[in-house]
């Protein structure tokens, strides 16, 4: 798809790309939908990058355009700020100021280039927001169908903490959120069939693969934690043992990690073949940077807490947290369980994975706290789901 993307070129695509970049430039680099809430911040800087990369027009060889992630960044003109110059789309050929961004797949290029032929950017934003809303409703309906209605408050609140309007309107955030919701829906609807056909670890590997292909390292762990929590919840309604569920959950985590890592290594390998040593050197520098701490003045733990505080520092979110905790406490009191289901403790796995991810990639989590905090919303979901699974209603399912 990356190769065929640049064969798509229409006047409408160029016009819509130019209008979109102009609009984002007018809005500023990082506007907030709700003032003071970093969770509602839109990353217009990266959205401009995505649009200029997807709609790039050049006379470069097709392979180089497909794997370099080229865009045109014009220098500031008289009386023009750096941001105004950056938020300018150019379809001049040959492009005088090409900037490569080769470490990512830029898998969005084909779809976005095609969609820009049909829709203006604002129409596309509304369609993405609708797609997210539709998948959210589908996931909730499937949770009811599979007898997981007790998890709906935990699921809804955890997703709400990610600021759904920002997820739907921001080009950078849309791929991960849509893939995560689609994975949840497929798992809820087709879990027995997936187990018999491809196998659940392979299904999770495909999730990791597609996230890596379409995402620019935003909050990919959401695509693991949310489906994994639903899988654990589904399995606690069967007769699977603690050991059997532990093995299954771990294999799914390994599958996701392998799919994610192998897709990235494939990109690096192709970079080497197409772009030579320069492409690999750029990737190596970024790996070292992202695995470093956020700076000498901030420990990894400080950066983790800063990400958590995107949610916990806001009064509105604290009220919601207290309301959910009160609801969960009332649930436990009403059920008065005589014994607990120990398999629910496996929710510690999707709770810990986002924490470990944030600690490992602390440089990235420090630079981009306003969206990397969303990785931890999977941990919120696991924490909120724990009481419901520890003391479940006994309605076994196949």
Which residue ranges define each predicted feature?
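Membrane-interface helix-loop-helix junctions at transmembrane boundaries of multi-pass membrane enzymes
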Residues: 329-352
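Aromatic- and kink-enriched transmembrane "portal" helix at the membrane-lumen/periplasm boundary
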Residues: 110, 156-179, 207-213
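Membrane-interface junctions at the ends of membrane-embedded or membrane-associated helices
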Residues: 188-200, 233-247, 334-339, 387-398
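Membrane-interface alpha helices of multi-pass inner-membrane proteins
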Residues: 200-230, 248-262
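Membrane-lumen/periplasm interface segments of specific transmembrane helices
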Residues: 249-327
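Hydrophobic/aromatic-rich transmembrane helices and adjacent perimembrane loops
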Residues: 368-389
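Transmembrane-helix motifs of polytopic, lipid-linked glycan transferases
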Residues: 129-153
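Juxtamembrane segments of multi-pass membrane glycosylation machinery
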Residues: 110-128
């Amino acid at each position: 798809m990356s190769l065929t993307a640049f064969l798509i070129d229409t006047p409408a695509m160029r016009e819509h790309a130019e209008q979109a970049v102009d609009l984002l430039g007018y809005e500023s680099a990082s506007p907030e939908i709700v003032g003071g809430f970093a969770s509602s911040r839109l990353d217009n800087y990266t959205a401009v990058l995505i649009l200029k990369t997807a709609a790039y027009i050049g006379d470069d060889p097709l392979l180089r355009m497909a794997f370099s992630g080229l865009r045109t960044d014009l220098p500031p003109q008289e009386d023009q700020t750096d941001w105004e110059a950056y938020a300018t789309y150019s379809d001049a050929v040959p492009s005088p100021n090409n900037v490569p961004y080769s470490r990512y797949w830029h898998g969005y290029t084909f779809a976005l280039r095609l969609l820009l032929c049909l829709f203006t950017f604002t129409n596309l934003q509304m369609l993405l927001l609708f797609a997210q809303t539709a998948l959210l409703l589908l996931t909730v309906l499937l949770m009811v169908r599979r007898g997981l209605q007790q998890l709906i408050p935990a699921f809804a609140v955890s997703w709400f903490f990610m600021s759904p309007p920002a997820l739907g309107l921001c080009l950078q955030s849309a791929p991960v959120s849509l893939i995560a919701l689609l994975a949840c829906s497929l798992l809820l609807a087709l879990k027995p069939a997936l187990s018999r056909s491809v196998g659940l670890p392979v299904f999770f590997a495909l999730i990791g693969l597609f996230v890596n292909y379409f995402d620019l390292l935003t909050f990919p762990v959401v695509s693991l934690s949310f489906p994994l929590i639903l899988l654990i919840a589904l399995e606690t309604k069967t007769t699977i043992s603690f050991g059997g569920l532990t093995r299954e959950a771990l294999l799914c985590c390994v599958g996701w990690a392998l799919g994610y890592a192998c897709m990235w290594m494939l990109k690096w390998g192709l970079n080497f073949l197409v772009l030579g040593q320069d492409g690999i050197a750029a990737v190596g520098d970024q790996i070292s940077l992202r695995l470093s701490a956020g700076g000498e003045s901030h420990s990894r733990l400080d950066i983790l807490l800063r990400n958590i505080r995107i949610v916990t520092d806001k009064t509105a979110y604290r009220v919601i947290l207290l309301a959910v905790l009160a609801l969960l406490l009332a649930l436990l009191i009403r059920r008065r369980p005589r014994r607990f289901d120990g398999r629910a403790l496996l929710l510690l796995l999707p709770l810990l994975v986002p924490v470990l991810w944030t600690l490992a990639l602390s440089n990235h989590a420090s630079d981009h706290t306003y969206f990397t905090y969303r990785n931890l919303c999977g941990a919120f979901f696991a924490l909120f789901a724990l009481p419901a699974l520890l003391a479940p209603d006994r309605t076994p399912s196949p």
